[in-house]
Regions:
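Coil-to-beta-strand transition motifs
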Residues: 1, 75-77, 178-181, 192-196
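Residues forming anionic-ligand binding surfaces in small-molecule and nucleic-acid pockets
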Residues: 4-14, 112-151, 234-245
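Conserved metal-phosphate-binding beta-hairpin within the catalytic cores
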Residues: 82, 181-202
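Phosphate-binding core of ATP-grasp and ATP-grasp-like enzymes
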Residues: 116-130, 167-180, 202-207
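A long amphipathic alpha-helix within ATP-dependent nucleotide-binding catalytic cores
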Residues: 146-182
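A translation/RNA-centric and nucleic-acid-associated enzymatic feature enriched
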Residues: 196-241
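Residue-level detector of conserved catalytic or cofactor/ligand-binding positions
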Residues: 245-253
């Protein structure tokens, strides 16, 4: 399987018309780094990002740097979200009822606070243009048991535990480089032996919130090295030619 990361960007589950030069190559190289860094935690689908290892068609210059040769997997229909800091839709929910995705959190937290422990908040994996739905861990078990009656709970527990372990390892490393990983999303699949394997992209600005450690101050929103700028611009410019009336604007997960 060949996975190609394009220079396009999406927001609110819609692909925008503008492109960002070399975005696909940067995201591919970031995923490559993190896949190699975490291969001792969970196996992943990456085989190679070298053009010489690709089928002839993908050896073309336009695919150089932004393509990954991967093991083909049966993907699990759960997006594995982990939050180490309270922000975005999690902060909005906490202000309303003191919970994030049904998980009760300590009183007195302020926006961008670090959580006592990372929390796992899975969601459904919607089709493009539809919206993912936050679900409880037990609901994720139900979803997987419908597909894998004898293994659903085992798979749900594994992807939860892998998600937390991956986040802790990577967040600790990122801090040494001056970066806070506020939250991120992982996806998993099954190989031919029925083993859980990490797939898709990993810890890119498309799937994560990255904040600079320098200047981090709880109690307010943080500058970010991700596509939050795009989301903010879209919400601030409802009269732009992106036809935002057709896009359901809500806080990102």
């Amino acid at each position: 399987l060949i996975m190609v990361a394009t220079d396009r960007i999406s927001a609110f589950d819609h692909i925008l018309k503008n492109k960002i030069t070399d975005k696909g190559a940067i995201l591919t190289q970031m995923s490559k780094f993190w896949f190699e860094f975490t291969k001792d935690v969970v196996p992943n689908h990456m085989i190679s990002v070298d053009a010489k290892d690709m089928p002839e068609f993908f050896g073309q210059d336009r695919f150089n740097g932004n393509s990954m040769l991967c093991k083909k997997l049966e993907m699990l229909p759960i997006e594995c979200i982990v939050r180490g800091y309270i922000t975005g839709s999690g902060w909005a929910s906490y202000q309303e009822n003191g919970t994030v995705c049904g998980i009760r959190l300590p009183e007195g937290l302020v926006e961008s606070d670090k959580l006592p422990e990372p929390i796992y908040t899975p969601s459904t994996k919607a089709d493009l243009g539809d919206h993912d739905e936050n679900i409880s861990f037990e609901k994720s078990v139900e979803v997987l048991e419908k597909i894998y009656p004898e293994k659903g709970r085992e798979y749900a527990e594994k992807i939860r535990d892998y998600t937390i372990a991956l986040y802790k390892k990577c967040a600790e490393y990122a801090l040494t480089k001056g970066i806070i990983i506020a939250d991120t999303k992982f996806e998993f699949g099954l190989n031919e032996q029925g083993e859980v394997v990490l797939a898709d992209e990993m810890l890119t600005p498309d799937s994560s919130r990255f904040w600079p450690l320098d200047g981090y101050k709880p109690g307010q929103g943080q500058p970010s090295f991700d596509k939050q700028y795009v989301r903010d611009w879209l919400k601030a410019n409802p009269d732009s030619d992106y036809k935002l009336s057709l896009i359901h604007i809500s806080e990102p997960t």
